[in-house]
């Protein structure tokens, strides 16, 4: 029984923790579920985000309680209830495949739907065993310490979630973490057959929507609606496989030129510009002016339609160029809307949420003279 107990504890602690450090990632996965089941409009987005945070807190707490042998009735009952819900759900996911993966371990460990179902069968058996033998669980700490551990556990996981939500995840398991080379992440090993992707563009004219590709992109009389990346032929899939930057004005693919630029380039990432936080827009405009002054590139990346981009420009006075990119890719790049990423020759040097942007006290000289990888708003520049 103790083997089952510690197995459940380890899995729940790990699962809860990786969700807590990336609450927006969990939120996006919940949105995927609701969209797949046709339930996206049933609840407001703030409730979906709250559910993501509460779920991570419950999983982490259950794991800690099982490990220390405290709150035994609560922990064993909740563990069993979670597995009663998740096991048949993941069986359905394995059979119907409405989402690519369950997201049970976030981006830290991606399992196929069948692997997830097999894992949940084992955990369900363990949960039943622990529930039946709950009274035999040995407590490792005193009753007084149990109360303190319980309170600290809840406090820790909620503070962690809200900190990572307000800033960026303290651990980045995605292929776009600081220090990664985007170009290398897109490379196909010699001899491997690459997957074939195609960018699809939906544009509208005279009330009629039509789909285009880069080969037949229409003239400026058409209004852009959205873009998406479509898998045409499955092959070897590199860690980064859908990074494509297309100019809004010309329809030109700028991916290679931006990733090959030997200078610094700021990328303002806003997966849906109409939902982006505009509280720090003056600072964003200052960073753009700084980029122009020093000859650095600056592009805004979004998947929003052209009319929403124009509304953003009118509201914020934005003068920087806009480019189109796949919505899922933008969400993967940075967990902030908007967020800012600094790259050079395809290497990610730093990322900032809109709450931690570098300001005029830091961005005074050339980036060659400052420790850009440690820039933070209202902080002195730290040495590398």
Predicted regions located by residue number:
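Membrane-embedded alpha-helical segments of integral membrane proteins
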Residues: 84-137
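A short, hydrophobic beta-strand/beta-hairpin element that forms part of a small beta-sheet core
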Residues: 338-351
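Functionalized membrane-embedded alpha-helices
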Residues: 1-21, 46-89, 130-131
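Conserved small/polar residues in nucleotide/adenosyl-binding loops
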Residues: 373-380
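Membrane-interface segments at or immediately adjacent to transmembrane helices
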Residues: 160-253, 257
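Short active-site neighborhood of thiol/selenol oxidoreductases, capturing the structured segment around
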Residues: 258-275
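Short, internal strand/loop/helix patches
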Residues: 13, 298, 315-337
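Internal/C-terminal transmembrane anchor helices
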Residues: 141-168
């Amino acid at each position: 029984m103790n083997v089952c107990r510690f197995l459940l504890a380890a899995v729940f602690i790990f699962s809860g923790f990786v969700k807590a450090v990336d609450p927006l990632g969990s939120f996006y996965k919940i949105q995927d579920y609701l969209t797949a089941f046709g339930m996206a409009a049933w609840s407001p987005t703030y409730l979906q985000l709250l559910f993501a945070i509460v779920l991570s807190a419950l999983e982490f707490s259950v794991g800690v309680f099982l490990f220390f042998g405290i709150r035994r009735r609560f922990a064993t009952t909740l563990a069993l209830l979670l597995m009663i819900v998740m096991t048949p759900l993941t069986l359905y996911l394995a059979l119907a495949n409405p989402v690519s993966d369950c997201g049970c371990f976030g981006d830290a460990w991606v399992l196929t739907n069948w692997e997830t179902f097999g894992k949940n069968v084992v955990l369900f058996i363990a949960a039943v065993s622990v529930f039946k033998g709950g009274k035999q669980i040995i407590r490792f700490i005193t009753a007084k310490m149990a109360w303190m551990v319980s309170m600290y556990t809840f406090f820790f996981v909620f503070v962690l979630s809200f900190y990572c939500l307000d800033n960026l995840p303290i651990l980045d398991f995605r292929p776009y973490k600081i220090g990664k080379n985007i170009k290398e992440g897109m490379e196909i090993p010699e001899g491997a057959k690459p997957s074939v992707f195609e960018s699809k563009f939906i544009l509208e004219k005279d009330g009629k929507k039509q789909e285009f590709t880069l080969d037949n992109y229409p003239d400026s009389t058409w209004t852009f609606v959205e873009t998406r990346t479509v898998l045409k032929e499955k092959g070897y899939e590199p860690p980064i496989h859908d990074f494509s930057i297309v100019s809004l004005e010309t329809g030109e693919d700028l991916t290679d030129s931006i990733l090959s630029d030997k200078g610094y380039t700021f990328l303002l990432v806003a997966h849906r510009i109409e939902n982006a936080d505009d509280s720090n827009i003056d600072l964003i405009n200052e960073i753009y002016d700084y980029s122009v002054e020093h000859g650095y590139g600056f592009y805004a990346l979004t998947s929003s339609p052209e009319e929403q981009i124009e509304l953003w420009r009118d509201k914020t006075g934005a003068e920087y160029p806009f480019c189109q990119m796949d919505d899922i890719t933008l969400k993967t790049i940075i967990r902030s809307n908007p967020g800012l990423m600094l790259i050079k020759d395809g290497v990610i040097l730093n990322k900032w949420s809109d709450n931690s942007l570098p300001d005029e006290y830091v961005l005074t000289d050339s980036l060659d003279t400052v420790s850009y990888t440690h820039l933070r708003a209202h902080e002195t520049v730290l040495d590398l």
